[in-house]
Amino acid sequence: SGKQALAKKEWLKQRFDEGLVFYRSEERGKCFIEYIPTENAWVPIEAGGWLYINCLWVSGSMKGHGYSSELLSECIRDAKEQGKKGICILCAEGRKREFLADPKFLKYKGFKVADISDCGINLMYLPLAENADQPRFKDCARHPKVSETGFVLYYTDQCPFTYYWVPKVQEAAKEHGISFQAFHITDKEAAQNVPAPVTTYALFRDGEFLTQGIQSDKKFLALAGIK
C-alpha cells in the first residue's frame, strides 16, 4: 500500500546521510540492492570499514536473468571505490530462508562465513582488502535471547511489510489473549544492540528466537497454536 511504501521511503531518506545506497536495476522495486557502511548498519555486528548489504531483492518473475549478480557487482565496485575492507550480509545456514540472502549464491560469489548465530543465521563476508579483520556478531546477536515470556517482537521500518502486518498481529494476539509485546526500533543505537542478528523483524517465543519471517495474522495464530 501507499502508506507502507511511505514508511519505508521515510526510513531510507533518513539513512542517505549515513551513506546508504539504494540501487535499482528494474523499475517498480522488483530488483534492488540496499547497502550502508557497517558503522551505520542497523544490525548488531562489529565490522569497522566494511559495507553491509541490508537487502538484495530480486522478485520471482525477475529471477534467473543475472540481476542479483549485476546488483552485487555494483556494490563491489562501490566498495572498492570507497576503499572498504569488503562486504558483509546475513543469510541462513545451509538454505535460502525468507527475507535473507541465498547462501549458495553468496558462496558461488566468493563469500565466506564470518560468524554464526545460535539461531542458524550466518554473517557472510567478501574481503576486498588483504588481511582485513573479519566482521563478527556482537554477543547479543550470536546468542539471541530475551527474558520476557510469551511472544516478543523487535522490528524496524526498513521493510515495508512490517508497517502493514505488525498491527494486524498485535490485534490478533489481543483478540485471542496471547501475550505479545512489540518493540519498534527507531534509531541506529537501539538496532545495534537488539538481542538478535536480524533487526528488521525478530520474533521470540518464551525467550527463544523463533523467526525473522514477517508474519501475517493467520501465520502468527498458527505459530501460537490457534487454528
List each model region and its residues.
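Active-site rim helix/loop that mediates acceptor-substrate recognition in acyltransferases
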Residues: 1-26, 40-42, 189-191
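Conserved beta-strand in the GNAT
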Residues: 24, 28-39, 52, 57
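Conserved acetyl-CoA binding element of GNAT-fold acetyltransferases
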Residues: 44-60
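Conserved acetyl-CoA-binding loop-helix of GNAT-fold acetyltransferases
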Residues: 58, 64-80
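Conserved GNAT acetyl-CoA-binding A-motif
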Residues: 79-98
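Conserved catalytic-core motifs of GNAT/GCN5-like acyltransferases
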Residues: 90, 107-124, 210
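Local sequence-structure signature of Cys/Sec-based thiol-disulfide redox active-site neighborhoods
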Residues: 140-175
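Non-catalytic, surface beta->alpha helical segment in thiol-disulfide oxidoreductase systems
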Residues: 206-227
